[in-house]
Amino acid sequence: MARIAGIDIPSDKRVVIALTYIYGLGNKLSHKILNELKIDQNIRVKNLTEQQLSALRIEITKYNVEGDLRREVTLNIKRLMEIGAYRGLRHRKGLPVRGQKTRNNAHTVKGKPKAAIAGKKKNKVN
């Protein structure tokens, strides 16, 4: 397993697919990086030379990936909440942010239904 950007990349997969295991690198960006470095996209990670791996590491450091990207996203959301923006309020309430309706679905954001379950009624003995 090769280690790039603090992530162990699976060695039996193709390089294009393996790069997508890094948070912030999708299919399109991995294609772009490999084209810039002139590395074959169908080659397996285990067949890469040390020079190619080091070139990949250097190229990936140019992009905002993994911990830095996660931190940036959370800080952006926190900033929206602090300034009182509508999107920040939606994040705070745990509701959809991008204008979706909430009458029916939106369960992935809202979580499980919090319906009140009636307790068992006890008989009063007089």
Swiss-Prot record:
Q: What does this protein do?
A: Located at the top of the head of the 30S subunit, it contacts several helices of the 16S rRNA. In the 70S ribosome it contacts the 23S rRNA (bridge B1a) and protein L5 of the 50S subunit (bridge B1b), connecting the 2 subunits; these bridges are implicated in subunit movement. Contacts the tRNAs in the A and P-sites.
Organism, per UniProt?
A: Aster yellows witches'-broom phytoplasma (strain AYWB)
Tell me the Gene Ontology biological-process terms attached to this UniProt entry: translation
Question: Which GO molecular function entries does the Swiss-Prot or TrEMBL record give?
Answer: rRNA binding; structural constituent of ribosome; tRNA binding
Gene3D superfamilies per record: 1.10.8.50, 30s ribosomal protein s13, domain 2 (4.10.910.10)
Keyword annotations for this protein, in alphabetical order, are: Ribonucleoprotein, Ribosomal protein, RNA-binding, rRNA-binding, tRNA-binding
> Self-association or partners: how does it assemble?
Part of the 30S ribosomal subunit. Forms a loose heterodimer with protein S19. Forms two bridges to the 50S subunit in the 70S ribosome.
Recorded hits in InterPro entries, A to Z, give:
Rbsml_uS13_C, Ribosomal_uS13, Ribosomal_uS13-like_H2TH, Ribosomal_uS13_bac-type, Ribosomal_uS13_CS
Q: Where is this region: Disordered?
A: 94-126
| Region forming the signal peptide | none
Q: Which gene encodes it?
A: rpsM
* Protein known as: Small ribosomal subunit protein uS13
- What family does this chain come from, according to its entry? Belongs to the universal ribosomal protein uS13 family.
Q: Where is the composition biased (Basic residues)?
A: 109-126
This protein's source sits in the domain of life called Bacteria
